[in-house]
Structures are given as C-alpha cells and as structure tokens.
C-alpha cells in the first residue's frame, strides 16, 4: 500500500497560486494518498478553496512532523528546475504539474482564489476611488504591500 503524501510549496503568493491547478490534479488522480500541503510561504492562497483549504498547513504548525509528516512521502516541487519551464515550453503552473504529477505538459484549469467578503469590499472601494479620481472606466490595480496592508473599516455600501 502506498504511503500518504505531503506537498511542500515555498515562496510567495505567485508560486502558491501557480501550484493550485497541479495540486488539484494530484488530488483528483491520487485521492487515496490523502495529500496535504505544507505552505512555507503561508496558507492564504488556499484559504476558502473547497478542495485545498482543509489540506493546507503552515510549516510552523504544532507537531507537524510527528502528527502529519513522519509517515508520509514528502514532495518538494521546484518548478524553476523543470526543463520545460526554463526552456520556455510551459508556464509556471504547468511546471508545478510536471514536478508534482510527472505527466508532461498538459492543459490545466485556471487557479481560482476564494476571496473573503472583506477582501471583495476593500477591492470594490479601491476600484471606485481610482475610477473617481482618474475618470477612467477601466483600471488595473496593483497591491504592492503584501500581508502588511491594513484594510480600513468597510461597510456594505462601499
């Protein structure tokens, strides 16, 4: 019988988000291995995800090794070391899929992020403010503050 699996994902939000379709495929194709995700850069990208949320653990989770890892096979995918990626044959998400699932280049669904109500309200407020100030109908918003951003109090109308 095969051992269960733990997949380590390191780096920031971009790497975490890029890993989502490959991990979804792994779960779909290896449900019997009951995979968990060890999120070295935080669990934010997996929060609220119907298949991944309950599988995601911070690397500082109490008793992580003893309770969750010691009886599992450990995968540490490194998409930047995948030949197809560094030869520009595939995307970062596909490189994760190759590193995790070893099925070559294949089409993957888009990564979906589940946003909280607070995040949606904050984004609406930010977009409305920028549209009002610029007079433009279409905008692109970059949020360069990472986890350090402090949202203001919001209400449903904003």
Protein language model features and the residues they cover:
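Catalytic machinery of carbohydrate-active enzymes
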Residues: 1-158
């Amino acid at each position: 019988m095969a051992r269960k699996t733990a997949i380590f994902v390191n780096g920031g939000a971009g790497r975490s988000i890029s890993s989502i379709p490959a991990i979804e495929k792994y779960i779909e194709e290896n449900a019997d291995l009951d995979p968990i995700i060890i999120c070295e850069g935080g669990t934010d990208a997996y929060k609220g995800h119907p298949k991944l949320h309950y599988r995601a653990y911070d690397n500082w989770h109490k008793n992580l090794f003893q309770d969750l890892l010691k009886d599992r096979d450990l995968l540490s995918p490194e998409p930047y070391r995948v030949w197809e990626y560094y030869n520009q044959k595939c995307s970062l998400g596909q490189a994760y899929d190759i590193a995790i699932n070893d099925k070559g280049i294949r089409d993957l669904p888009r990564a979906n992020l589940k946003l909280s109500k607070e995040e949606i309200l904050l984004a609406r407020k930010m977009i409305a403010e920028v549209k009002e100030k610029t007079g433009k109908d279409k905008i692109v918003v970059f949020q360069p503050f990472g986890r350090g951003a402090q949202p203001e109090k919001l209400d449903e109308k904003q």
